[in-house]
């Protein structure tokens, strides 16, 4: 089985690095994406996965073209503006999924190198993992990943399967004379996609697979971001805790200087890795926030102007988009706060009995921590909770403009 139910590990068992990235890696493979495909000795499996991925995205983008065509046709008139705005958030979601997959493909080798570097500094034995509190970070990360994934995939699943479930219940259980052949997304097909039952189901399941591909590619890039930031946060917090607890008076000056030298090297490497995370993900997050602002706006507009059935569907969509932005901002804020802690810990440790040279090195550590590790999308401030409020503000401005246009 792809997702086997695993027995939860106790705090007395060693956690491997691969366990922290297994969920996004395995989930990604369900659409054919394997980050480590170049290391797969099975050439046939490698090319089959690649073919499945390309085929899935060709199918996905063919339906996106149909959505765009539907939007263009209906945006021309105020009488069909509601129908146009109904498909707009789906188009925005699709563009985000496409752009994230494109960004991952471009930065694949850099991302693999980043994961390899994180694996090199990952604590391996049980005693070290207890000091790093690896078990806590793994549990917290898995909870966030699970809830985030369920919410986002609920959106795509509800839009995909609701029309078929509704039609089936009405036809077989409620005695409806016809089986309504509707689709979960508004699409302008270049052929008659409803008259012939075979064509309808072929198109319907093609659309369902398209939604699944979009959902997985949309979610998994964020899951990889969560996995990398979680580990960097773990390293920064370990440095801060270890630095604050260090008693310089119990060691010789030579031992103190050696300790600080090793810690500075370790800190510098963690900062370099955080900068690489910024280089890989910052532009993706910029587009993500811009598109999310529009998606939240259009989904919110549909909630205020649609019938009860659509309100439920778009509320799920609205919630998933909000949570996605919040999760990214939360982990960006965690990176900033954990790396900033190092300076406070350096100041709070018992440095009074130490030498002048030791104190001078501490000053450099404190000065470096004034510029914390962060993710900095172009034109945006470093990602934090303040960024979340900025995205919400942008969404509301678009929403107010749209309501003014629609209601006059």
From Swiss-Prot:
<feature type="topological domain" description="Extracellular">
    <location>
        <position position="74"/>
    </location>
</feature>
<protein>
    <recommendedName>
        <fullName>Putative odorant receptor 92a</fullName>
    </recommendedName>
</protein>
<keyword id="KW-0716">Sensory transduction</keyword>
<dbReference type="GO" id="GO:0004984">
    <property type="term" value="F:olfactory receptor activity"/>
</dbReference>
<keyword id="KW-0675">Receptor</keyword>
<dbReference type="GO" id="GO:0034703">
    <property type="term" value="C:cation channel complex"/>
</dbReference>
<feature type="topological domain" description="Cytoplasmic">
    <location>
        <begin position="1"/>
        <end position="52"/>
    </location>
</feature>
<keyword id="KW-0472">Membrane</keyword>
<feature type="transmembrane region" description="Helical; Name=4">
    <location>
        <begin position="210"/>
        <end position="230"/>
    </location>
</feature>
<dbReference type="GO" id="GO:0007165">
    <property type="term" value="P:signal transduction"/>
</dbReference>
<feature type="transmembrane region" description="Helical; Name=5">
    <location>
        <begin position="277"/>
        <end position="301"/>
    </location>
</feature>
<dbReference type="GO" id="GO:0050911">
    <property type="term" value="P:detection of chemical stimulus involved in sensory perception of smell"/>
</dbReference>
<dbReference type="GO" id="GO:0005549">
    <property type="term" value="F:odorant binding"/>
</dbReference>
<comment type="subunit">
    <text>Interacts with Orco. Complexes exist early in the endomembrane system in olfactory sensory neurons (OSNs), coupling these complexes to the conserved ciliary trafficking pathway.</text>
</comment>
<feature type="transmembrane region" description="Helical; Name=7">
    <location>
        <begin position="379"/>
        <end position="399"/>
    </location>
</feature>
<feature type="transmembrane region" description="Helical; Name=2">
    <location>
        <begin position="75"/>
        <end position="95"/>
    </location>
</feature>
<feature type="topological domain" description="Cytoplasmic">
    <location>
        <begin position="96"/>
        <end position="144"/>
    </location>
</feature>
<feature type="transmembrane region" description="Helical; Name=3">
    <location>
        <begin position="145"/>
        <end position="165"/>
    </location>
</feature>
<dbReference type="Pfam" id="PF02949">
    <property type="entry name" value="7tm_6"/>
</dbReference>
<dbReference type="GO" id="GO:0170020">
    <property type="term" value="F:ionotropic olfactory receptor activity"/>
</dbReference>
<dbReference type="GO" id="GO:0032590">
    <property type="term" value="C:dendrite membrane"/>
</dbReference>
<feature type="topological domain" description="Cytoplasmic">
    <location>
        <begin position="332"/>
        <end position="378"/>
    </location>
</feature>
<feature type="transmembrane region" description="Helical; Name=1">
    <location>
        <begin position="53"/>
        <end position="73"/>
    </location>
</feature>
<feature type="topological domain" description="Extracellular">
    <location>
        <begin position="400"/>
        <end position="408"/>
    </location>
</feature>
<keyword id="KW-0807">Transducer</keyword>
<keyword id="KW-0552">Olfaction</keyword>
<keyword id="KW-1133">Transmembrane helix</keyword>
<feature type="topological domain" description="Extracellular">
    <location>
        <begin position="166"/>
        <end position="209"/>
    </location>
</feature>
<feature type="transmembrane region" description="Helical; Name=6">
    <location>
        <begin position="311"/>
        <end position="331"/>
    </location>
</feature>
<dbReference type="GO" id="GO:0005886">
    <property type="term" value="C:plasma membrane"/>
</dbReference>
<dbReference type="InterPro" id="IPR004117">
    <property type="entry name" value="7tm6_olfct_rcpt"/>
</dbReference>
<comment type="similarity">
    <text>Belongs to the insect chemoreceptor superfamily. Heteromeric odorant receptor channel (TC 1.A.69) family. Or49a subfamily.</text>
</comment>
<feature type="topological domain" description="Extracellular">
    <location>
        <begin position="302"/>
        <end position="310"/>
    </location>
</feature>
<keyword id="KW-0812">Transmembrane</keyword>
<comment type="function">
    <text>Odorant receptor which mediates acceptance or avoidance behavior, depending on its substrates. The odorant receptor repertoire encodes a large collection of odor stimuli that vary widely in identity, intensity, and duration. May form a complex with Orco to form odorant-sensing units, providing sensitive and prolonged odorant signaling and calcium permeability.</text>
</comment>
<keyword id="KW-1003">Cell membrane</keyword>
<feature type="topological domain" description="Cytoplasmic">
    <location>
        <begin position="231"/>
        <end position="276"/>
    </location>
</feature>
